[in-house]
């Protein structure tokens, strides 16, 4: 095992793979986590993200997940894996992998700037991708906005770090308390789809409240009450309560209900101006009523197109 301080190298450092003999030059440090340090790098042909591992076994687990995703057609949850090897430096061996460099904005930053509707769209995208991950036998584990990136250009959510990915049935070892159902006393840390789904709901709480909150003496009731009283969460309280209570066993189930509630909420929002005009029709001419109805119809149609582009 290698300490994180031992994984900090100067820009321009050249890495040579022990087995595959590929060369990579480190351009700049991108970040460090519990299991390693990531650099922007360059191979002979392209820009890459290079992860130097603190623990070889953890890296092997992450590489195996990325390989499985590479076998799926049209997957888009994580980065493409280009290479994984060992680097011999000063008598020590550091395991590393070279991956697709994902250029964008961390979801944790995007959620602070975007309207709440976007948070729902991002979670819908995430649920589609989690369905694929669960299908091949893994849960994400440490699912949180900091481990997700919003691609630029476009509004596609991708994952930056599969270090916490865990095989179904095993115990999740890497987690962040706020997004962990074990912390909230609402289920254990067994790797199953519902573990990731709970984290998705907590992303909605974070987006709606603008911060992480502390648990109370009755955490389950605390979360349910928030879903019923927080204005931005109220339209989605059915999905939130079902998830908190562990009623969804597949990401596709949660996604179906969340999409339905999002469309219903948007339809209701667009109908309110028309209803206001109808209540005042004694004071309003027929043409203005038609205008309000037409405007609402156009807005609803535009929103449906938006959903098709970014969600479906």
Predicted features, each with a name:
Residues 23, 27, 34-63:
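ATP-binding glycine-rich loop module of kinase domains
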């Amino acid at each position: 095992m290698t300490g994180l301080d031992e994984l900090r190298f100067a820009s321009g450092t050249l890495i040579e793979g022990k087995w595959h003999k590929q060369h990579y030059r480190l351009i700049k440090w991108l970040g460090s986590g519990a299991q390693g340090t990531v650099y922007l790098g360059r191979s002979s042909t392209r820009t890459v993200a290079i992860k130097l591992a603190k623990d070889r076994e953890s890296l092997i687990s992450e590489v195996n997940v990325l390989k499985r995703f590479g076998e799926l057609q049209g997957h888009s949850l994580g980065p493409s894996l280009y290479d994984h090897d060992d680097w011999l430096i000063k008598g020590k061996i550091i395991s590393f992998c070279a991956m697709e460099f994902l250029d964008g904005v961390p979801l944790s930053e995007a959620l602070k700037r975007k309207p709440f509707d976007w948070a729902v769209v991002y979670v819908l995208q995430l649920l589609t991708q989690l369905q694929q991950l669960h299908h091949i036998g893994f849960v994400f584990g440490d699912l949180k906005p900091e481990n997700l990136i919003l691609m630029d250009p476009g509004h596609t959510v991708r994952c930056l770090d599969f270090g916490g990915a865990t095989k179904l049935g095993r115990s999740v070892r890497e987690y962040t308390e706020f997004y962990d159902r074990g912390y909230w006393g609402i289920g254990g840390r067994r790797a199953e789809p519902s573990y990731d789904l709970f984290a998705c709901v907590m992303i909605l709480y974070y987006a709606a409240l603008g911060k992480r909150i502390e648990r109370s003496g009755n955490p389950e009731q605390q979360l349910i009450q928030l879903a019923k009283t927080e204005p931005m969460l109220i339209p989605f309280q059915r999905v939130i309560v079902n998830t908190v209570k562990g009623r969804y066993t597949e990401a596709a189930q949660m996604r179906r209900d969340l999409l339905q509630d999002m469309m219903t909420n948007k339809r209701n929002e667009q109908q309110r101006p028309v209803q206001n005009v109808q209540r005042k029709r004694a004071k309003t001419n027929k043409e203005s009523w038609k205008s309000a109805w037409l405007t609402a119809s156009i807005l609803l149609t535009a929103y449906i197109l938006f959903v098709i582009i970014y969600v479906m």
